[in-house]
Amino acid sequence: KVTIRNAFRYKKRMVMMLLGIGGCTALMVTGLGIRDSVAHILDYQYDEIMLYDASATYDSDSADSVEEFLDDRSGGYITGYQDTMTVSSGSGEKDANVIALNAQESEGYFDLHDSKEEIPYPTGYEAVVSSKLASQLGVSAGDRIFLNFDGDSVGYTVTGVCDNFVNHYVYISEESVSDDAPNAAYIMQGEQEDIQATAAGLRAIDGVSYVSVIEQERALMENSMSSMDYIVVVVVLFAGALAFVVLYNLTNINIIERM
């Protein structure tokens, strides 16, 4: 009763209490907000954007062997060109994963969209850029970017900025890199197919440099992000302890004054 009476009686006391509790609450909300903001990142990335189950990159000379192996499965696949290269604009440059696919074949394997609408897969010398990369390069739809193909700078017009939560990506058309043979495959798991066995079979082919199974990649990232839970717990505990200290001190002051 004394604490409540003094809070309403003395404006400074009320301000102290409100600021103290408000600050503690803000700290707690921040901690929980951080956790909530990253909780669904992997779901968005691998359930709504990248829809395939595995991918492989290989030397172009091994393309026939890889496709022959994949043809013997029940699941589907598409091939394209993928490489890490420098992407530049008038505002700077960044390294990014560049993926070149046939626009029609990409459906069902990649879903390019922003928060408002679907973004058509680019054709000709068009490009769709992932959101974080676009922000860092200072580009938006209608701007020009340049990709460095082994020393040759090739210009593309940005037709869209898509949502993306893991790494940087630039999507371009297969026809714009027609001189480069396919060096990547994106694979859908067939009915009753063991995707791990498929991955092992791909790794056994000469010239295959990397095989990624989305399930494994997702598990690794979930494990690395689990440390965020400990940070949230620490922040919430400190916020609660600080709120207790604030209320305890204010109550003590009020009781002492009453005595």
Which functions belong to the PLM regions below?
Residues I34, V38-D47, G201-Y248, I253-E257:
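Peri-transmembrane interface segments
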Residues Y44-E48, E68, D72-G76, G80-R144, ...:
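Short beta-strand boundary microenvironments
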